Amino acid sequence: MTADAPVISGSSVVKLARGVRLHEDPVRGQTVLLAPERAMAVDDIAVAIVQALDGERNLDRIAADFAEKFDAPVEEIAEDVRTFVQELSVRRMLEIVQ
């Protein structure tokens, strides 16, 4: 984590920054998160997290929704969601709403 990156917690409400979007790359057969002058390959789990970042629900709510949907421990999912979102924050691909 860099000094410039805000701390992400379960109460954080975030959405993708302007100009950042998911893109299917048919040539490589993978999904990438595109931002101005940079890209990040993402797997199916990351795609699900990115799609859930609606700027309305906090990360704890998103994790609880995933835990219910996938019948998995909420604590484990919450940690994975926060870690991935922190990485997006460091890469300046997010906007913190609250």
From Swiss-Prot:
GO MF annotations, alphabetized: quinone binding
InterPro entries cross-referenced by the UniProt entry: PQQD (IPR008792), PqqD_bac (IPR022479), PqqD_sf (IPR041881)
Top-level taxon of origin: Bacteria
GO biological process: pyrroloquinoline quinone biosynthetic process
Pathway: Cofactor biosynthesis; pyrroloquinoline quinone biosynthesis
One of the Pfam families matching this protein, by short name: PqqD
Keywords: Plasmid, PQQ biosynthesis
Purpose of the protein: Functions as a PqqA binding protein and presents PqqA to PqqE, in the pyrroloquinoline quinone (PQQ) biosynthetic pathway.
UniProt subunit comment: Monomer. Interacts with PqqE.
Family statement drawn from the similarity comment of this UniProt entry: Belongs to the PqqD family.
HAMAP family in alphabetical order: PQQ_syn_PqqD
Identification of the protein by name: PqqA binding protein
Gene: pqqD
